[in-house]
Amino acid sequence: MSRPIVAIPCCSKIIEGYTFDAVSRQYSAAVAHAAHCQPLLIPLDIALVDIGAVLDVAKGILFTGSPSNVDPKHYSAEEPVMPDKLDPARDAVTLPLIRTALERKIPMMAICRGYQELNVALGGTLHQEVHEQEGLHDHRERKELSLEERWGPRHPLKLKGRLREWIGQDEIMVNSLHGQGIKDLAPLLQPEAFAEDGLVEAVRGPDEHPFCLGVQWHPEWRVTENPVSMTLFRKFGAAAGADVS
């Protein structure tokens, strides 16, 4: 039996003046090895993307993390704090793709930037600099550490709702590599996990949606070695129609 297709919108990457559509391979590997689905990369030029056609063939969509941020013009009147870290081509594809996928009840999983896109697409807002907000911690990547330490477990999350039910734990440890975070939660989303400072780090879509999960951390990192990450990707794969037994 053919594996169900999971669409993965790319990021823009400029190399020697040429624009490339790129995705870190660990996302594609997680879709293939943990969710048991076939990853299919989606280019970012909106002129090349027929959202209806993508959703006609995709049984699920993974919205990945990225070095870039969602342009604040999509959720506030604020100027971007880091204008050099925007990816307008990605915004132009992912935000309408999320809204249409929700309407068509296509399973979605959203990670880091993708998690923030999910919130913005559905009417929520973001902190552009979490570490500058009173009472919130610094969740940014610690680049002075080794790669293994940077991507390893850093702080606990308190779980609730469906996420707690799936994982069977009240608390988990997660990595932390993000500068932005949810400020106002979109009305259609439900909070599922909280950091020690109260920041919402996981959300779920409406109950009637087959699978709509967003997480602020990076479960794709060494996914097959992490039982919690495997649970999330297997749930996603099963919702997309994969045989995850």
Regions found by a protein language model. Give the residues of each.
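N-terminal beta1-alpha1 cap of cysteine-dependent amidohydrolase-like domains
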Residues: 1-109, 120-127, 131-166, 173, ...
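Conserved G/P- and acidic residue-centered "switch" motifs that form tight phosphate/ATP-binding loops
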Residues: 112
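The feature captures the ABC ATPase H-loop/switch
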Residues: 115
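A short, structured beta-strand/loop element
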Residues: 209-211
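Active-site-proximal beta-strand elements of phosphoester/diester hydrolases
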Residues: 213-216
